[in-house]
Amino acid sequence: MTQDKTSLRILIVPNYRSPYDQRMVKGLADGFHQIGHYARALPAPIHAFELAEMCKVLSINVVIQVNQTRDPDIPLPSHVRHISWFQDVFPETLNGFADGFHESDILYVLGDPGVLGLNVQLPCYVGSLMTGVDQAVINHRQRSVSSPVDFSLCGFIPPPFVTTSSARQDILWYWDNLIRRIPVLGRSKVLWLIRKILFRRQLPVNYVPYAVLSVMRDTIEMMYRPLRGELDIHELANSIRKISALYEGSFPTLPAVDRKRRSPNRLSMLLKPYAQRYVGRRDIKGLFVRYLAAENPTRNADTLSPFDSAINYFAQSYPRMLDRVVLINDVLQVSKSLELYGPGWASHLEFQQYHKGTIENQAGLLDVYRRSRINLANNTHGLGLHSRTLECMAVGGFIMMHTSPHDNKPGGMLTSFEPGVHYGAFTPDNFQEEALLWLEDKEKRKKAGLQAAEMVRSKHCWSHRALQIVDDLSR
């Protein structure tokens, strides 16, 4: 399709320089091309100064950024519409989030905004946008595959929670906080730096006492029910805060970061990718590199306090780990023919023999989907329509996923697919029974895969996502 006078000119910026992020933004750009709009996908995030200049040079009128809002200090050209596409749950401790939006902006989330933890009022349109699949993925089903396996799971698992008690470090932390409580002086930036210089070799910058971490862990294990897709990060985070009330006020608030920035030059742009390595370091080399890169010398602007970072981990990442540990243990009761792919699995000793590494290319991932009799999927908050789910279905792979009370909400499986027809559904109580039934019925698995692939082609290509965005921009 050719462009016309009303065609948009769109710039799409990933969250990270990673194969997955690059594949997603390129797929969306191709979707825009298919419906007649110019779109350019960047391979990596760029500085706000560069983004504003690129909009001018390329005559961009729409910017889509993954997991980013507008920069409040460096405005885009006035005619540019901004779209934030958040693909992660929202941190419980996120402050000032609404300040990054204009009335003309759009915020998309990967699923239902409320379920994912968005609890602030925004001045702009808020909607849901799923990932899509491209024609190359659909065509991949024509390739032959061999060496079938009963079960596979492709995805990240957080490492196990391992911490050792250290009375020495806990006492140092206690004295450090006594110093902080000195009236007026204790909260000064100068004393904050002095304390960190004095204790930095004996006490990590983000240290949280063993007793606090243990209370947080026990709270989550008591409250969270794995493999039900009902995670409420606010409920868990608030519970952690209440139970940890004994330590309230013991965790220092980091001094505000001065948001005034220097304009980038060639040297700062060259060094910026390396500056992240030196966050929190106060040696001469670290300070010098971050200064030359025009970054805050000691930390990032979005750095959370140690207490808030621990809350985010236990309210978001720890439930994800519990889900996958429970799921794989259930699988091993059915069959030892199992392959696990992705980062994190090697850190779980009980699963190391099943870990086959991390797949770096899409073709390898699609091959695993096709040769697995059952592709395992789980989610903590009802987001069934993950990119892996859609890509697996697109090549005819068979998916098993647990039910969720959010299955009928945006991003839920029941918004597009029917259990028993397009995929296999299970609960924590009947996984083994359901898995055995699907393993023994090859024809039913094959039929479900074919029907799911047809549904993906008709509703979940990148061109469908591009059309949705164009329609939403005209609201």
Language-model features, listed with the residues they occupy:
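Short, polar loop motifs at secondary-structure junctions
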Residues: 66-72, 89-91, 110-116, 341-348, ...
